[in-house]
């Protein structure tokens, strides 16, 4: 799986290897073809606001945006699945300046917030959405399950990033989040 991170935000504290690992884990969990490609862009408030206005026709900045390229669905590893070809999933745009406020309000680190938003972005690239309350509940439940399992699997996989956060805001429901994620 090819995952590239482009830090265009000027924020040096963003752990690019951690974002790659959590994205790779999410894609693996969802049975995405191992040759799939993904780009993660770390951007500033001005850039994310411009994208948010231009592509979503919504004012102001946001935390994460996803731009899918090839249509791809989870499940390539199933025995009954057709053999897919490698695909370019698309781009995830993360804004640590915006995410930092959300992390503070939720009582956890910026790193955890960016991990959560990375999983959220991956799900959007794979066609998950939160337009209806039912879809929102399913998407956030899956997002939280993947993220919690990623934390739990670190030792087994021989990686060590941050410890699994605890507290009410660590793995939010859809109702706990601002309605600014896209």
UniProtKB/Swiss-Prot annotation:
Claim: Metal-binding is one of the keywords in the record: yes
GO molecular function: metalloendopeptidase activity; RNA endonuclease activity; zinc ion binding
GO annotations of cellular component type: cytoplasm
Enzyme Commission number(s): 3.1.-.-
Main location: cytoplasm
Biological process annotations from GO: rRNA processing
Cofactor (UniProt): Zn(2+)
Keywords annotated in UniProt: Cytoplasm, Endonuclease, Hydrolase, Metal-binding, Nuclease, Ribosome biogenesis, rRNA processing, Zinc
InterPro entries: MetalPrtase_cat_dom_sf_prd (IPR023091), YbeY (IPR002036), YbeY_CS (IPR020549)
Annotated segments matching region Disordered: 157-182
Cofactor note as given: Binds 1 zinc ion.
Places the protein is found: Cytoplasm
UniProt-listed Gene3D superfamilies: Metalloproteases ('zincins'), catalytic domain
Residues binding Zn(2+): 120, 124, 130
A Pfam family matched in the record: YbeY
Summary of the function given for this chain in its UniProt record: Single strand-specific metallo-endoribonuclease involved in late-stage 70S ribosome quality control and in maturation of the 3' terminus of the 16S rRNA.
Family named by the database record: Belongs to the endoribonuclease YbeY family.
Name of the featured protein: Endoribonuclease YbeY
Organism (species): Corynebacterium jeikeium (strain K411)
Name of the gene this protein is made from: ybeY
């Amino acid at each position: 799986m090819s995952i590239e991170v482009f830090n265009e935000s000027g924020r040096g504290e963003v752990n690019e290897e951690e974002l790659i690992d959590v994205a790779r884990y999410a894609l693996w969990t969802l049975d995405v073809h191992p040759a799939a490609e993904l780009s993660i862009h770390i951007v500033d408030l001005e850039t994310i606001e411009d994208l948010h206005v231009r592509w979503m026709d919504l004012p102001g900045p946001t935390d994460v945006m996803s731009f899918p390229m090839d249509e791809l669905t989870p499940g390539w590893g199933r025995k009954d699945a057709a053999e897919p070809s490698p695909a370019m999933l698309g781009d995830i745009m993360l804004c640590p300046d915006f995410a930092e406020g959300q992390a503070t309000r939720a009582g956890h680190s910026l790193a955890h917030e960016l991990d959560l938003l990375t999983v959220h972005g991956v799900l959007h690239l794979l066609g998950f959405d939160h337009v209806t309350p039912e879809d929102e509940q399913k998407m956030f439940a899956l997002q939280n399950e993947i993220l919690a399992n990623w934390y739990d699997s670190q030792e087994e996989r021989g990686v060590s990033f941050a410890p699994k956060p605890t507290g009410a805001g660590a793995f939010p429901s859809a109702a706990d989040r601002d309605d600014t994620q896209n």
